[in-house]
């Protein structure tokens, strides 16, 4: 039973990658609102996979099978009808090791701006160069942005 105090409720979550690796099996978990929660376990135990499920980053990977429910504020975020862009505005994450999305350098850098609705070429071009310059990467990658 989901209560108003439950922010995230995971029911019988299963995930298998295309290489047949079962990453998650029978996961049941309730994360209350306004609380700090911790996931810990051995390397390769599925912690990062579980976190990627919460904002549907696994949609960008080679998942063979996924089942169960993940309720975020009562909404099953695994349903195909869920607006993934809106979900990712609400559920963000920062991993210890940065993970680039499977896009070009340009698309990775500009992803947040485009997600927020910015599509003016000049604004995007300036933001791209400014961001990569501030990260001391412009000279290294300017010729291979796409």
Protein language model annotation of sequence segments:
Residues 20-22, 84-85:
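Short coil-to-beta microelement around the adenine-binding A-loop and adjacent beta1/P-loop entry
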Residues 55, 106-115, 125, 129, ...:
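Short helical segment in ABC ATPase nucleotide-binding domains corresponding to the A-loop/adjacent helical element
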Residues 61-62, 97-107:
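Conserved catalytic motifs of ABC-family nucleotide-binding domains
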Residues 71-76, 117, 121-142:
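Conserved ABC ATPase "signature" region
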Residues 40-42:
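The feature captures the beta-strand-to-loop junction immediately N-terminal to the Walker
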Residues 8-10, 24-26:
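Conserved structural motif at the start of ABC-family nucleotide-binding domains
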Residues 63-65, 76-92, 115:
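ABC ATPase NBD coupling module
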